[in-house]
Amino acid sequence: MRIGLMIGPERGRYATKVDRLRADARWADQAGLATVWVPQIPDEFDALTAAALAGAETSRIEVGTAVVPIQPRHPIALAQQALSTQAVCGGRLSLGLGVSHHWIVDEMLGLPYERPAATMRAYLDVLDPALGGPGPVDVENELFRVHNPLDITDVGPTPVLLAALGPAMLQLAGERTDGTLLWMADERAIGSHIVPRLTRAAEAAGRPPPRVVAGIPVCLCRDDEVDAAVARTNRILAEAEVSPNYQQLLDRGDAREVGDLLAAGGEAAVERRLRSFADAGATDISVRVVPIGDDRDQLVASLRRTRAFLAELTTSFASPAAPASPGEPASPAVESKAVDTGAGSR
């Protein structure tokens, strides 16, 4: 199983946002992690722009978006941005896409949120050839009429993963993409709902085994601090729970809130919980570090402890190198001074 790290800016700390994002990407690259995942938050950095920054600062690690909503962007516009980012990343970009949520697309953006799976299928009809390499894109379907040349990079096809939670999107992800990106999915939801549907669809389409990237909050702490870590996780990450999409996914598992997904405690407890996701069928873990503490110094120390342990786990989990240019990772001792105080929840 591959271990990746969610990175992203803290809200409100404007002067150092870019430097901190770069530092986080460098740390993950040098520490040997498989992937850095950049979230798309409605009021924050654009994920593909941030991914380009991360790619320019690194040489080995996979850089992924988690996830870019399709509704605000024409598929050719997204393809241009993704291919431009791929050129910066040197072939290390994986494009995570999603249909977002009704309360974002309709209520915040004023765009229609209808037939999301059908919309994504029509979108991929355009995006697939656009990401496949230089040349014309000629597609006409129920939503798009496109006759557009693209000649941005000759880097091979850009991997695409879908934020697929329900049966229709899982079917589409297995048929047409490289896998799925998950949030709010516990072990039972992954093992009994996600993996079987996704795998069957991929097999029927003659595609290779799909990736299953599970987003998991993690806090390395003492046993007597676990309750505080759970409370903090619920406080800073509970916003997603209001989405019907995530509620339906929670209903398919044993978790009832995001704190139930937290891998917390000592090294053995954290490793055991992460391995339980691998046993359920996750191919990747995208770690959202949740630091705890009463002040900024304690938060920084907590974040560093958890990250250092993640670097150690990459070896014991035998995470393969991400598809990237060759390069030996440096010592994981290099650490960013940034700390996520919880503002940048997904």
Language-model features: where?
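Active-site-adjacent structural elements that line small-molecule/cofactor binding pockets in enzymes
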Residues: 1-346
